[in-house]
Amino acid sequence: MSAPRVSFVSLGCPKALVDSERIITRLRAEGYEIARKHDGADLVVVNTCGFLDSARDESLNAIGSALSENGRVIVTGCLGAEPDVIREKHPNVLAITGPQAYESVMAAVHEAAPPSHDPYIDLLPPQGVKLTPRHYAYLKISEGCNNRCTFCIIPALRGDLVSRPAADVLREAEKLAKAGVKELLVISQDTSAYGIDIKYQTSMFGDREVRAKFLDLSEELGKLGIWVRMHYVYPYPHVADVIPLMAEGKILPYLDIPFQHASPQVLKNMRRPAHGEKTLERIRGWRDVCPDLAIRSTFIVGFPGETDEDFEMLLDWLDEAKIDRAGCFKYEPVKGARSNDLGLEQVPQDVKEARWHRFMQRQQKISATQLAKKVGKRLPVLIDEAHGTSAKGRTKYDAPEIDGSVHIQSRRPMRAGDIVTVKIERADAYDLYGSAV
């Protein structure tokens, strides 16, 4: 009897990608083959995103394509928390489960296409089959979020903060490092809140106890001898405790912090945990300790009630903060978000567009200035793609997918996963260019 074949679609953020990796691990362990195409597979699993309307549309379209090409579809992920929305457009899906519902997904798969042999779960590592390149991996340390930002529905989709025991996280990280992973990208909904829900409980890792706390976890990960990059860090005061580890080279001098805005009134309406002036003070303090710290962030323009004065305050804040990398989103109402019920005046779409363009132009100049400081330096670069003597990679200041790249020429062939020293010869607003030395 041939093994059942499952095609898989993974949409959304890195947290959802980790969920997909875990499901695929279970499928592989139970003897299922992962098909590259929907056509010819026994069924299709679609891991959806449901955060923004554009993401919901993408998910619904992906479900429709899978139904058209295969006809037997199981839906999971964040949009799965709204089964009525899915059934209304696609009534013929086989089953719908919400996010992180691994057992429910497997039960639906078993019913639709029974496994060809008994499962041997121990044959595969608990961290799962990786969907990223072999040289980097996402390390998810918690699920859910305790914050109640008015524009966000993640707590409704994924629940409150649930931190993993520190020893579990570290065992997974250690296995990844031993398997040849060169870079770990630490992710969650709120990385700096790690352990709060379990009162920083300790667990045994090897011969010692480790606390489930942001600082302690960072210290332990820093002992692995590979790149460790922190994502989704809220700007709490205790983030300052981790900066010395970056200055010492234990973890990468990089913080991904979603500041979202700078106007006190807009931040209050968003229910964000920081004030623009306070974050500027914190950024200055962090850079005093670690001068080469790179900061990436995301912002929202056109939030209900945002005035011209609020927006100008944001631009002024950008000039002061000198954020290295920044993404910007035009606010769009999300079904179920409390920002819909604040009674604030909606910002016209043309105003949102104009503000977005002004934001991006301002940030482009700042990014270009920051990158120009790298010209003439010799920097270690992790190769992501290689084509003989030309390659593309990243410095310790850039995360995959969301930041810039280093375009490299070399006299000798390079391979993905290599770390090479590159002399930076020029820069633009997004990327660096140089030669391997």
From Swiss-Prot:
Alphabetized GO MF terms: 4 iron, 4 sulfur cluster binding; aspartic acid methylthiotransferase activity; metal ion binding; protein methylthiotransferase activity
Keywords of this entry: 4Fe-4S, Cytoplasm, Iron, Iron-sulfur, Metal-binding, S-adenosyl-L-methionine, Transferase
E.C. designation(s): 2.8.4.4
Annotated PROSITE patterns: MTTASE_N, MTTASE_RADICAL, RADICAL_SAM, TRAM
Chief subcellular location: cytoplasm
Pfam families in the record: Radical_SAM, TRAM_2, UPF0004
Chain's role: Catalyzes the methylthiolation of an aspartic acid residue of ribosomal protein uS12.
Protein name as annotated: Ribosomal protein uS12 methylthiotransferase RimO
Gene transcribed to yield this protein: rimO
